[in-house]
Amino acid sequence: MTDLKGRIALVTGGGRGVGAAICKMLAERGASVAVNYHSSKVDAEGVVAEIEKTGGRAKAYQADIADANVVKKMIAGIKSDFGGLDILVNNAGLVFRKKFSESTPEDWKKQVDTCLYGALNCSHSAGPLLEASGRGRIISIMGDSSRVGESGLAIGAAARAGTIALMKSLAREWGRSGVTANSISLGLIETAHDKAWVEANRDKLVKAYAIRRLGLPSDVAPLVTLLASDAGAWITGQVISVNGGYSMV
């Protein structure tokens, strides 16, 4: 049911962590994968090499998703190289942990540009291809702070909450074309923060989770694969948490 043979996927921020795990699992299920990166070319090309080594098809694409014109060129390149697009995973994000009272408009802009406008730009440019597919999928990744709020993450939470509303709206608008749009909200993933900070605070952090550990990229990729496949064809407009029991709302 999670067979993705013949499908083409774009994963933003696909060179590292959760994005890399998603790329690899989609490829394992048979999808051709466009691995987007902003600055980590070596990482993205490493993911491509791993996929190709196991007989899969993948290519790295450099693009700042906050720039609408650059995104349009990337989508056009994917169409030219692969023939279309069936799956969009809005994974790339940028979040600064800082008290709201100490944050600046420059901080706000950087996070909103990547987290909200990035999803807007990619969804808008990919939309015609996803609708033409007849089985298009949009899956947006975010932190659970976008659902329940969190001190120090006000801007990132607000930007990602906007993405949740975008997914729900696109689920309604594009559903008649067979497109589904869902959000996955995450607890703290091991690879998403500075390793030294995680180790210094691990004992305190894990106490917030019903399952007493932090998340791994491998915890996220299976749900993305499900939603991208025919098995997820009747799931749309939803926010699904993969969070070890951090929040249960």
What are these regions (language model features)?
Residues 45, 172, 176, 183-209, ...:
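A glycine/serine/threonine-rich, flexible loop-to-helix segment
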Residues 97, 139-162, 167-176, 188-189:
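Catalytic loop of short-chain dehydrogenase/reductase
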Residues 128, 172-173, 233:
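Alpha-helical segment proximal to the catalytic Tyr-Lys
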Residues 148, 208, 225, 236-249:
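Short C-terminal tail/terminal secondary-structure segment
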Residues 8, 15-16:
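Conserved glycine-rich cofactor-binding loop
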Residues 99-112, 194, 205:
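Substrate-binding pocket helix/loop in short-chain dehydrogenase/reductase
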Residues 135, 175, 180, 235-237:
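Short, small/polar-rich loop/turn modules that mediate ligand/substrate recognition or access, typified
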